[in-house]
A protein has these predicted regions:
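Phosphate-ester processing/binding pockets and catalytic centers
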Residues: 1-191
Length: 191
């Protein structure tokens, strides 16, 4: 039996697509590791990565905040802490079924980092969450998290009619995006 990761890597090799660690913003704009990858190959890479995500036994949830509704770091931190603690508490049996919960975060936003620690340590107990440094280039699941964030952000743009030409180039029109990317991902949503 081939693991989903090995299957993904095999499909890329067979299609002669370079295996660049997935990073949505860079893929869409041809930056960083995608600088020498053609638009066509970046589209094929996106399609293969979406297919890979569909095969994974994962679930995800989204905590989303609008800058107009959150005034300052303290308020953002408080909302994240409250919402995350509530989500974990409401699903405590599920979370307690694990001996350890590994939490990967790149510490990109201090408020998020503090809220993650506070909420999880409060609800689960201090020794359950295992905090690790996130390096998306070395971990496929972090790349999956980036893919999920990319699709979720772009879904908002399509819903508001603010999709860009770049979005349409990679994801198609609204209907195609909803069918090929959004709907597939929503099947993995937690709860």
């Amino acid at each position: 039996v081939i693991s989903p990761i090995k299957e993904y890597e095999k499909r890329l090799a067979m299609a002669e697509i370079v295996d660049v660690p997935f990073h949505g913003k860079d893929l869409l704009h041809g930056n960083e590791g995608y600088a020498t990858v053609s638009v066509g190959d970046r589209k094929r890479l996106l399609t293969q990565f979406a297919r890979f995500v569909r095969t994974l036994p994962i679930t995800y949830f989204v905590l989303q905040y609008d800058a107009t509704d959150t005034h300052g770091r303290d308020e953002l931190e408080s909302k994240i802490r409250r919402d995350l603690a509530s989500l974990v508490y409401d699903n405590l049996e599920f979370f307690q079924s694990f001996d350890t919960i590994s939490v990967y975060y790149d510490n990109g936003q201090g408020a998020v980092s503090v809220a993650l620690h506070d909420a999880l340590d409060f609800v689960l107990a201090k020794n359950v969450a295992d905090y690790r440094v996130a390096d998306y280039s070395a971990r496929r699941l972090l790349q999956v998290a980036d893919y999920i964030c990319t699709v979720e952000r772009i879904a908002i743009a399509y819903e508001d009619g603010r999709q860009s030409k770049t979005h349409e180039r990679f994801f198609g029109n609204r209907r195609t995006f909803l069918q090929s990317f959004r709907k597939q991902l929503l099947r993995k949503r937690f709860g």
